[in-house]
């Protein structure tokens, strides 16, 4: 582990179209090989697809989807007396958002539609309706935390 100080947290700028920091973070998460323009096009096209399909504001649908994806509890491995326990802990707000975006993009990439914008749009709409792979990931995480509730007293 590095002995230097922790790097300062860099603030992301809100995106120009929706004036939202979480949309900027989504664009950064979708981006591959530093191609931000391509990533932004994918995200904005997905949002326009969502607006056409649902008739609602795409940003509201996205925020609903994120609420449905973001985990409240997760398990952390803790070594006590020679054995590892999966200890359920609450997820910090920053990490909730990070995990939610990660799961959303990974689930989108794993889908079968032809283009990434279609996959992302469908996954966001599914998540807003409490279905889809990213919501299932959250449910699995919560189930794991619930199953290991007996070890909650090992929290540190």
Swiss-Prot record:
The record, for Pfam families, names: Ribosomal_S7
PROSITE patterns named in the record: RIBOSOMAL_S7 (PS00052)
Q: Which InterPro entries would you find in this protein's record?
A: Ribosomal_uS7, Ribosomal_uS7_bac/org-type, Ribosomal_uS7_CS, Ribosomal_uS7_dom, Ribosomal_uS7_dom_sf
TM region positions: none
Protein's GO biological process: translation
NCBIfam families linked to this entry: rpsG_bact (TIGR01029)
Known function: One of the primary rRNA binding proteins, it binds directly to 16S rRNA where it nucleates assembly of the head domain of the 30S subunit. Is located at the subunit interface close to the decoding center, probably blocks exit of the E-site tRNA.
**Homology family:** Belongs to the universal ribosomal protein uS7 family.
Per its UniProt record, what HAMAP family does this chain match? Answer: Ribosomal_uS7_B
Q: What is this protein called?
A: Small ribosomal subunit protein uS7
- The species this protein was found in: Streptococcus uberis (strain ATCC BAA-854 / 0140J)
What gene is behind this protein? rpsG
């Amino acid at each position: 582990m590095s002995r230097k100080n922790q790097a300062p947290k860099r603030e992301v700028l809100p995106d120009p179209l929706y004036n939202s920091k979480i949309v900027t973070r989504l664009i950064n998460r979708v981006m591959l090989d530093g191609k931000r323009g391509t990533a932004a096009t994918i995200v904005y096209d997905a949002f326009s697809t969502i607006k056409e399909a649902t008739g609602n504001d795409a940003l509201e649908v996205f925020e609903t989807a994120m609420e449905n994806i973001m985990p409240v509890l997760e398990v952390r491995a803790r070594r006590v007396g020679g054995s590892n326990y999966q200890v359920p802990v609450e997820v910090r707000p920053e990490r909730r958002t990070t995990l939610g975006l990660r799961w959303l993009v990974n689930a989108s990439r794993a889908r079968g539609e032809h283009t990434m914008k279609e996959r992302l749009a469908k996954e966001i709409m599914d998540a807003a309706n409490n279905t889809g792979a990213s919501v299932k990931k959250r449910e699995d995480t919560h189930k794991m935390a619930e199953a290991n509730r007996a070890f909650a007293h090992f929290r540190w």
